């Protein structure tokens, strides 16, 4: 993974921990960072067993991927979350340590625009106990990612009570940054 970054002219500094950074919450706690600064590297697939099309989503730790939005962004009829075995076979890494780069095969990469709200984000570095800091613009280049809105849109309680309002992810045009999901 470090070599993959070096091939693109970027030096990354891997930070390791004794404790797990397997989940976004664990990583944020270990780093003393905001949950939104943690890059979740999530593998999705489309197609059948013989022709799986893998998609890697780089998602802010506060967001969840909306499958319908992801399918629409990718121009696919449907997508589903890859199994742990599929993710390992497609990337060469186990869930909880999947980095945004350095996979055993080329993947289509979609990046959550909410990551751009931060000066630096933290991505997995190949192990559930290792991460690396990277500016979002550099991450996009390293991963050869397309930036697209793939986060869920949720219903939040109305401040007045009773009725609910639709809350878009922070990156949606005209929406405040407080509307992200966890």
Predicted regions and their residues:
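Extended, low-hydrophobicity, polar/charged segments
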Residues: 1-182
């Amino acid at each position: 993974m470090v070599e993959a970054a070096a091939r693109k002219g970027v030096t990354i500094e891997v930070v390791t921990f004794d404790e797990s950074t397997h989940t976004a919450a664990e990583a944020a706690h270990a780093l003393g960072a905001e949950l939104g600064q943690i890059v979740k590297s999530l593998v999705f697939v489309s197609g059948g067993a013989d022709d799986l099309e893998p998609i890697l989503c780089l998602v802010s730790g506060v967001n969840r991927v909306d499958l319908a939005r992801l399918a629409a962004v990718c121009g696919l009829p449907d997508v589903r979350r890859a199994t742990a075995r599929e993710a390992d076979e497609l990337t060469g890494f186990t869930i909880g340590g999947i980095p945004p780069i350095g996979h055993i095969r080329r993947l289509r990469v979609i990046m959550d625009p909410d990551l751009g709200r931060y000066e630096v984000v933290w991505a997995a570095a190949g192990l559930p106990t290792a991460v690396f800091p990277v500016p979002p613009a550099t991450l996009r280049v390293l991963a050869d990612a397309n930036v697209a809105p793939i986060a869920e849109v949720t219903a939040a309680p109305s401040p007045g009570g009773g009725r609910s309002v639709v809350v878009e992810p922070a990156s949606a045009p005209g929406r405040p940054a407080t509307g992200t999901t966890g």
